[in-house]
């Protein structure tokens, strides 16, 4: 069973330098592998700290072609951390949406469809790491220990990672359809 929701693309971003911090764009072209020119582009990637089951450097499938955050969750993280704001680009996001205050809880396998027909497949939560925390710290140098606070406060609200299921152009302001797969849980009968 599928549940349909809507959201709006408030911002589009690309990491086209060696830094994971993204810069704002009006349009992006999604291709198999992600966003051409983006730091995370590719069908495969080298295994790192997030894939401890593989030797570091092993070539594996790239589940993080696109990163999405919600404006509502960014605001919630900022509130928890006691800072005025957290921008999507500080988190390395490629897409910032509004209208989905629970974006991070979107189930794996959910689809995000743009007006052009471009489609993303949700691969799950983007676990918080220290790098965005260090960027946030650089904007608020008078508040100590924000880097580590980010990891703690962003858990469960940091956004999601996706792969491109269907290429296409996306634009700031696009109305997005989200199709979330709602699994029915079957319980085994208890033995008496």
Swiss-Prot record:
Pfam families given in the database record: MOSC (PF03473)
PANTHER family in the record: METAL-SULFUR CLUSTER BIOSYNTHESIS PROTEINS YUAD-RELATED, MOSC DOMAIN-CONTAINING PROTEIN
Source domain of life: Bacteria
Protein encoded by which gene: yuaD
InterPro entries in the cross-refs: MoCF_Sase_C (IPR005302), MOSC_domain (IPR052716), Pyrv_Knase-like_insert_dom_sf (IPR011037)
PROSITE patterns: MOSC (PS51340)
GO molecular function terms attached to this record: catalytic activity; molybdenum ion binding; pyridoxal phosphate binding
Record protein name field: Putative metal-sulfur cluster biosynthesis proteins YuaD
Location of the MOSC domain: 15-179
């Amino acid at each position: 069973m599928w549940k349909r929701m809507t959201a709006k693309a408030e911002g589009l971003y690309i990491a086209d330098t060696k830094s994971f911090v993204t810069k704002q764009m009006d349009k992006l072209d999604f291709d198999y592998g992600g966003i051409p020119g983006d730091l995370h582009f590719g069908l495969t990637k080298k295994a790192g700290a997030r894939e401890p089951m593989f030797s570091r450097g092993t070539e594996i499938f790239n589940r993080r072609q696109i990163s999405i955050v919600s404006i509502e969750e960014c605001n919630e993280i900022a509130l928890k951390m006691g800072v005025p704001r957290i921008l999507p680009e500080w988190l390395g996001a490629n897409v910032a949406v509004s209208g989905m205050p629970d974006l991070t809880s979107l189930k794996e396998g959910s689809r995000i469809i743009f007006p052009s027909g471009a489609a993303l497949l949700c691969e799950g939560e983007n676990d918080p790491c220290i790098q965005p925390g260090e960027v946030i710290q650089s904007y608020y140098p008078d508040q100590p220990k924000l880097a580590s606070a980010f990891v703690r406060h962003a858990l469960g609200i940091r956004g999601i990672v996706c792969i491109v299921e269907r290429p296409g152009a996306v634009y700031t302001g696009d109305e997005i359809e989200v199709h979330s797969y709602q699994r029915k849980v079957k319980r085994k009968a208890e033995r008496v």
